[in-house]
C-alpha cells in the first residue's frame, strides 16, 4: 500500500465554522516588530517573537504559507484558527490574539510562552533537575488541556514534547499546548483515517490505517510521560523501519535500569497508555483520577532558588532553543512533513535515544509484513 496523498480542499475532519477572530488585511509590520528571535521553523511555517508597537507586549508570530506544493491550504489554516478559538477558555492551550493575512501567508499572533518546549526537560542533561513531582504537575496539566479538546470532539494528533510549551522555565511554569495543524474533528458519521505525524510518536492505529479516535492522543501522552521520566524516547530505532516495528509490537523498555528512579505508580500510568488496542487505553478524564496524579506533593516542586544546578537548566534550555529548528503545521494532506525537528546543529544536546527525520515514508512501504 502506498502512502496516500491528500488534497487540502478535501481533507476530512476540518472545522468548517467561520473564524470569529477578524482576519486583518493591514500590514502586520505596522502593528508589530519582529525580533531576531526565531522560535521555530518548518517548510511551510516560521514562528518568531514579535512585540506589539502599541503595548510593548511580547507575542509569537506564526507565519503560515497558504499554498503548499501547489495546493491551496487556506482551509486548513482556518481550521487551526477555529480550534484555537474553540479552546480559548482553556488555560493549557496557547491563546490566539490576532490574525493577519497577506497575498501569500496568514500570520497567527499567539501568546508567547517564554519557557520553550518541554522537550528540553527530556534531555539527559536535565535528569537531576526535574523531579517526578514536577512531571506529575505537567502531565496533569496536559491531560486537562487534552480532556478539554476531547470534550469538544477535537483530537490533536501531534502531541509530543516539541508541541508542549512552558509559560516559564525559571521557575518551571505551566504548560501550553500548541500546533493544531494536524488536529481533526471527530464524532461525525464518517471515520477518520490518515497517515500523518512524526515517526517515533505515531500510534499503532495510524500505522495500521485504522480509524483515529481520542485514544490516539492518549498514546502520545504515554510517550511524553515516558520521555520526561526516563529522558529517552521509547520507540525510536536506528531507522524508520525499526521505529515502526517497535511501535507495532509495542517494544518498550521497562527494565529496572531504565526505571530505577521512577515510581511504580508512574510506571503503571505509562503502561496503561502504551497498549496497542486503542479501546483499552484510558481516557484523559479517567487518567486524571489515576493514583499517580493524586499523590502530587505541593511542597517539593521545582524551586530554582533552592537548586544548586538551577543555572544549568536555564543554560541548557537557552542553548537548545537557540540551536534547533522546529516543525511546520502542514500535515499529510499537504504532502510529507519535511520540517526539521529540533536538532541542535552540533548534536550535543540530543540523546542517542532521540532521532528525528525530515520526512514520513509510508509505514506500509517500510514494514509491509506488519500490515497484512
From Swiss-Prot:
Autophosphorylated. The keyword Nucleotide-binding applies. ATP binds at residues 39-47, 62. Gene3D superfamilies: Phosphorylase Kinase, domain 1 (3.30.200.20), Transferase(Phosphotransferase) domain 1 (1.10.510.10). GO terms for biological process: apoptotic process; intracellular signal transduction; positive regulation of fibroblast apoptotic process; protein autophosphorylation; protein phosphorylation. It comes from the Eukaryota. Its main location: nucleus. It is found in: Nucleus; Cell membrane; Endoplasmic reticulum-Golgi intermediate compartment. Interacts with CHP1; the interaction induces CHP1 to translocate from the Golgi to the nucleus. Keywords: Apoptosis, ATP-binding, Cell membrane, Kinase, Membrane, Nucleotide-binding, Nucleus, Phosphoprotein, Serine/threonine-protein kinase, Transferase. It is an enzyme of class 2 (transferase). Belongs to the protein kinase superfamily. CAMK Ser/Thr protein kinase family. DAP kinase subfamily. This is Serine/threonine-protein kinase 17B. It catalyses: L-seryl-[protein] + ATP = O-phospho-L-seryl-[protein] + ADP + H(+); L-threonyl-[protein] + ATP = O-phospho-L-threonyl-[protein] + ADP + H(+). The active site is at 158 (proton acceptor).
Amino acid at each position: 500500500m502506498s502512502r496516500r496523498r491528500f488534497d487540502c480542499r478535501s481533507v476530512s475532519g476540518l472545522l468548517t465554522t467561520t473564524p470569529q477572530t477578524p482576519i486583518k488585511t493591514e500590514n502586520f509590520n505596522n502593528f508589530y516588530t519582529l525580533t531576531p528571535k526565531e522560535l521555530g521553523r518548518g517548510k511551510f511555517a516560521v514562528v518568531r517573537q514579535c512585540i506589539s508597537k502599541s503595548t510593548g507586549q511580547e507575542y509569537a508570530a506564526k507565519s503560515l504559507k497558504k499554498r503548499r506544493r501547489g495546493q491551496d491550504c487556506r482551509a486548513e489554516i482556518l481550521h487551526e484558527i477555529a480550534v484555537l478559538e474553540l479552546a480559548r477558555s482553556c488555560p493549557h492551550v496557547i491563546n490566539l490574539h490576532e490574525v493577519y493575512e497577506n497575498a501569500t501567508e496568514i500570520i497567527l499572533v499567539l501568546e508567547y510562552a517564554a519557557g520553550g518546549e518541554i522537550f528540553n526537560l527530556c534531555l539527559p542533561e536535565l535528569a537531576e533537575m526535574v523531579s517526578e513531582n514536577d512531571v506529575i504537575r505537567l502531565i496533569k496539566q496536559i491531560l486537562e488541556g487534552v480532556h478539554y479538546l476531547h470534550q469538544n470532539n477535537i483530537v490533536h494528533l501531534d502531541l509530543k514534547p516539541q508541541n508542549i510549551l512552558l509559560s516559564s522555565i525559571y521557575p518551571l511554569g505551566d504548560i501550553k499546548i500548541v500546533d493544531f495543524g494536524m488536529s481533526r474533528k471527530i464524532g461525525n458519521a464518517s471515520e477518520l483515517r490518515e497517515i500523518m505525524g512524526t515517526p517515533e510518536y505515531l500510534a499503532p492505529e495510524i500505522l495500521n490505517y485504522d480509524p483515529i479516535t481520542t485514544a490516539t492522543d492518549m498514546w502520545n501522552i504515554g510517550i511524553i510521560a515516558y520521555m520526561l521520566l526516563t529522558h529517552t524516547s521509547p520507540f525510536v530505532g536506528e531507522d524508520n523501519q525499526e521505529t515502526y516495528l517497535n511501535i507495532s509490537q509495542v517494544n518498550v523498555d521497562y527494565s529496572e535500569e531504565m526505571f530505577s528512579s521512577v515510581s511504580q505508580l508512574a510506571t503503571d500510568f505509562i503502561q496503561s497508555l502504551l497498549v496497542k488496542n486503542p479501546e483499552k487505553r484510558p481516557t484523559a478524564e479517567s487518567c486524571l483520577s489515576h493514583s499517580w496524579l493524586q499523590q502530587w506533593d505541593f511542597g517539593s516542586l521545582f524551586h530554582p532558588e533552592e537548586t544548586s544546578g538551577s543555572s544549568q537548566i536555564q543554560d541548557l534550555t537557552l542553548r537548545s532553543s537557540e540551536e534547533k529548528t522546529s516543525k511546520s503545521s502542514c500535515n499529510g494532506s499537504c504532502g510529507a512533513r519535511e520540517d526539521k525537528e529540533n536538532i541542535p546543529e552540533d548534536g550535543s544536546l540530543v540523546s542517542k535515544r532521540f532521532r528525528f527525520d525530515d520526512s514520513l515514508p509510508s509505514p506500509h512501504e517500510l514494514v509491509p509484513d506488519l500490515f497484512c
